[in-house]
Each structure stands twice: as structure tokens, then as C-alpha cells.
Amino acid sequence: GNQFVPAVALRPDGGFVVTWESDGADGDEFGVRARRFTNAGAGVGNEGGVNDVTMFTQRLPAIGVDGSGNFRIAWQTEVVQNDFGVAARPFAADSTPQAVQFEVNVFTAGFQHNADIAVAADGSFVVVWQDDGQQADQDIFLRTFDADGDPTSAEIAVNQSEGFFRARPAVAMDALGNLVVAWEAELVGELHNIYARLFDADGVPLTGEFRVNATVAGEQKAPDVARQGTGEFLVVWESFGQDGDQT
């Protein structure tokens, strides 16, 4: 079958882990796979299945690695046909599963999807996702977990503003576990813009939301974010029309 939507995370030794969605991996539906590589790009062992629930579709994985090379993967899971949630699963540095997959979101009505993940050096992690049903509009939520995958917070609303929708969140973490979340938003009176907000390691907001892009002509979409250990961060995104035609 076809292989889609890869995500990658670097290991402390310079190697890396790639995860992706695989058409037909679970017999007839999409499943999530992963494989480790050395710092020279050589594969280590065979690819393995990430999800242990194989009914319906498992798609759109995101991955993060801790300071010991252990990794955590989050993805969109179809827990009931045509009803999507967010699942996650922790793995040891040798790719051995450390737990069965578990559901990240508490609120289950509507769609929860487009997840991203950031992992601290000690293995604790945060997952962000797009929620299409908990409030009047599409919104962004986060939840924090310890290294074993046990939740350490409730679902926390990320965006403050009201509008048509917020979508495709991305999250990054500094050395102290402080978070930056970026997302795409279409607010009242605006086209698509990129917004961000800072949180501490417990998910407590440190700022209000703020617009990232300076150019507002056209549409700004699909952000990603990276953060240095000292706290500085970089946001990238697609800009439609800024170069005169497309992105």
C-alpha cells in the first residue's frame, strides 16, 4: 500500500525515528508505523506498528524523543467509525512499547484530530490538537502527561479569540518544559493568520494569544514551531499570495 505523512524526531545520539501512516498496514485500513535509524541513515531493525487498536483508521502521527532516546507518538484514531479522537503511546529507545495506546482527549463528541506532541528530557510530554465540537467553533486544546503516559492536567483551552475556526496546531518545548503553541486561525474580519501562545510546563498560560505573521494579505496556513533550550522559538508557515502567486 501507499505510505503517507511522515514525521521525524532526532535522538540524542544523532540517530532519528520516523513515523508515518501506512495504507493497508492493519489489513484494510490506515495504520501508524515507525522505524529507527542511525546517524548515518541506516535502518535499525524492521518497521513496527505503533497502534494496537486496528479497527478503522489510524492516521496523521506526530513524534517526540526524550533525553534517553525514548519516544512518544500521538496520532488521529478512529475509535468509532467516522468519530475521530487523539491517541498516544510511549516507546523505549529500542522501540519496545512501554504501554498500550491510550486516548488523549477527554471530550469525545465531534472530531479531535491534527495532533502534535512535544517531549521533555525526562520523558514527560504534551499533546495539542484541534477540537471540532467541544465549543461553538473549532478550537485548540492541550494536555500534559508524565513519562508513563498518565495525565497531569485536564484538557486546557489554548486559543482565546472567537471566530470561524482554529486548526493545525504545532507545539514545541524549551529545556524547562515551557511551551509554545502555534496554530492557524480564521477570525471574524480576518483571512487566515498564524497565532501563538506561551505556557509553562504545567500548561498555565504565560501570555495571551498573539499574531505571528506581519503580512496579512492573502492567507497564512499550516504553521510549525521549534524552540531552543533557552526559550527562543521559530515559527514557519505557508503564505498564499505573499510572493505574488502561491506559497
Question: Can you describe what each PLM-predicted range is?
Answer:
Residues G1-T247:
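Extracellular, repeat-based ectodomains that mediate carbohydrate processing or recognition
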